[in-house]
Every structure is written in structure tokens, then in C-alpha cells.
Amino acid sequence: MAGRPHPYDGNSSDPENWDRKLHSRPRKLYKHSSTSSRIAKGGVDHTKMSLHGASGGHERSRDRRRSSDRSRDSSHERTESQLTPCIRNVTSPTRQHHVEREKDHSSSRPSSPRPQKASPNGSISSAGNSSRNSSQSSSDGSCKTAGEMVFVYENAKEGARNIRTSERVTLIVDNTRFVVDPSIFTAQPNTMLGRMFGSGREHNFTRPNEKGEYEVAEGIGSTVFRAILDYYKTGIIRCPDGISIPELREACDYLCISFEYSTIKCRDLSALMHELSNDGARRQFEFYLEEMILPLMVASAQSGERECHIVVLTDDDVVDWDEEYPPQMGEEYSQIIYSTKLYRFFKYIENRDVAKSVLKERGLKKIRLGIEGYPTYKEKVKKRPGGRPEVIYNYVQRPFIRMSWEKEEGKSRHVDFQCVKSKSITNLAAAAADIPQDQLVVMHPTPQVDELDILPIHPPSGNSDLDPDAQNPTL
């Protein structure tokens, strides 16, 4: 009895038993009552695994020490070899219990898929997707299925309550499908899409294809159309990277969306300002055309002219020509507009291009816009002996406009008075030979009186070589 080791009692306070057990089994980690209560609560399987881990912990810790960093301290490795098996055996059943619990819970779930949930900005993401795909689809409003891009757009004001009951239409733009709630289009009735899915569907003007999809916006890229769809949701179009402002402007004009600073946001401010300047220049020139240019055109037309040459001077320019020695370049036929604002308008090449396009749209022809020298006043006169005096004028560079409204400008103005059938015949006699006989007037020559008296009535049948003045031998 004395040689057999005493069983360990967790509640015992005998110091001899504590020292004896501590020295006889240094690798065993003893537990207090709190630990034993947890082990008892874990069950029989928990106790068996703990004992197994305690008995074989030395071999496993030795293998683990070989694969670990050998630069550690030996005492730290010894402590790790003592603690690791117990920690592993305590935590492993708990993890296994949670895994088994999750498996049982998943097996008890119904096999039907989780219903779809809507993201805050209106996109629909499936519950079976990964978290990365779900976050991407919720932020972009898109999802990729079967190798093609499908973008889902809906009215965010409807809320998640009406998602399943609201209508969906599929738009095909540049081989890309957009699933859209048509109510976002009807909120903008002045746009093309608003008319298509508003009054157009009511009057059966907008019809889908055989698959029930609508092919719209021909010639517009999917990236541009995706940015334009944001206008129906937020009222702002953000120009995507790699898309030029003229391309976005063309798409907005096609879809009847106003291209304004309040609706367009982009990083290239120079291109945006250029487009806005073109719009402003068009409106401004249409005003100048009606108020300043058209009255001068009417004055030229009333005088019988079919073209007009207008020079734009500033308000400070003074034209003082000498009546005796006027300019010799035909400036007297030019119309003059005194307007500093119009002068500043035509100073830019872009504005002149806009003005030329407006005049073409109004049906005018032979349009020329530029800057030329215009004489204002006489500087001096150079008199040459025996010749005409030379007048020197002061010239200023000012814009000019030249236009025509002549209808027959393509025909030749040459008047041909030669009565010939062909341009290759220059001889009048040869040309007259081709005149029909019924148009000819035959004029027979009348005989003269002195010839009737001299010529005999019966001319002799003799030799015709006889001299008529010779005396007849028979007489």
C-alpha cells in the first residue's frame, strides 16, 4: 500500500501528495475543480479525448518542435510541450461540436434557394453568390450571367417592398442587356426613352422583339448608355473614363437629354467647356442673325442683289473716305455693322465655324467667314508726274461675312448669240447648209437691161471662138 501511488483528489490539500505527484509525473498538467467541472459538463467523449491527448502529447509536441523555429529558447519549448496537448484537447471538441452543429443546422434547412434581396441602389444580388460578387453587384448595379453582361436598374424610390411586384423590361444596347424598371423613364417624359415607355407603349408604338426585349439606342455603346441610365436615377450623368465629351454629347442629343452643366460631370473640363461654348455661340449668333445681319440682307435683296458682303467694325471705328479718291478694291459694295460685341464674337475660329453651320442650316450658299483688311480713312496721296495719283488708306483687320441666296448659281452665265447648231461649227455658210429647205427663202437674180439689148436672140451655131465685134462677112 505504501508503494502504490495515491489517487489524486482535486479537493485535497495534502502537501505531501502534491509534491509526490509533481515530482513523479512532471509532464502531466493537473486541473482544479473548475476544470474538472467543465470536463464533466463536456461529457464522456470529452474526457476520453483529454486523456488521449495527455498520454500522447509528448510525441506530438516533439514532432511539432522539429518543424518549428529552432531559434526559440529550450525552456519555452518545454513549456509549450506541456501545455499544447491540453489546450488542443480542450478546444478541439468544442470546434468539432460547432462544426457538427452547423452541419446539422444546414441539413435541416429547406432545399429551396434563399429569396433575392435588393441592394440599396436598386440592384438585385443572389444569396448564393460570394460576398465579393455581392458587394460588387450591389455597388455597380450589375451581375454577370452566362458570359453576358446584364445590368439591373430600378427606381430606388419604390423601396424594397415593391421590388417583386414592379414591372421589368429588358433593353438591348450594344449586345448588352439592361433590366430596367420602366417607371424611371416615365419620370422624364421629355426624353426619348420616356416617350417610348410612356405614351409610346400606350399607343402601341413601342414594340419588343420576338423575345420580349427592346432594342434601343442604336450606335451608342453600352458604357455610355450605362452612364446615361444614371441620369434617370440621380439626374446626373458622369462621363466614364475613356469616353470623349463629343461622344457623350451625341448620345444625349440622340436620346433627347439636355446637355447642361447641372447634368454632366466629367474630369476633362476643357472639353466640357468647349461643348457648352458651342451651345452658347449658337444661341448668340441666332440672335445676331435676326437683329443685325438679316436687315442688311433684306436691303441687298431689295436692291436686286442676290448676295451680301458684310464687314463687322467696332463701335469706335471711323470710316472717312475721300470722295475724289475712294478705295480701289470695291469696298463701296460692302455693308457695315458697327458692333463691338459681334466683333468679339467673330474673333474666335470656333464661333465662326458655329456661325457657318447655322447659316447653312438656314439655306444660304457660298458662305465665307474670316478676317480681312478694311480701309477706314485716307492717310496720304502720292502724286506721280503724268500718272494717276496713288491714295494710301489706313486698313484695320475686321471680320467679314459673305453669303449668297442665288438659285441658279450652277448654270453658266454665258449668252451665245451665234446661230449655229453645234459649238464645233464656226463657219456660218456650213451652218446654213444644215437649215431645212422649208425655212429657206430662194432669191433669183434679175437680169439687167443692157445685157438683154446686146445678146442676140438666136446665137450663131458656128465657132464660138469668133470675135463678137468682128464684121459679119455675109453682110
Swiss-Prot record:
Biased amino acid composition, Low complexity: 108-142
Domain of life: Eukaryota
Biased composition (Basic and acidic residues): 57-80, 97-107
Region (Disordered): 1-143, 456-475
Keywords: Cytoplasm, Nucleus
Annotated BTB domain residues: 167-241
Residue ranges, compositional bias (Basic residues): 22-31
Keyword match Cytoplasm: yes
Region: Interaction with AKT family members, residue numbers: 146-475
Sequence ranges of Polar residues compositional bias: 81-94
GO biological process, one term: positive regulation of phosphorylation
GO terms under cellular component: cytoplasm; nucleus
Subunit structure: Interacts (via C-terminal 330-amino-acid region) with AKT1; AKT2 and AKT3. Interacts with PPP2CA and PPP1CA.
The protein's name: BTB/POZ domain-containing protein 10
Protein species of origin: Pongo abelii (Sumatran orangutan)
Gene name of the record: BTBD10
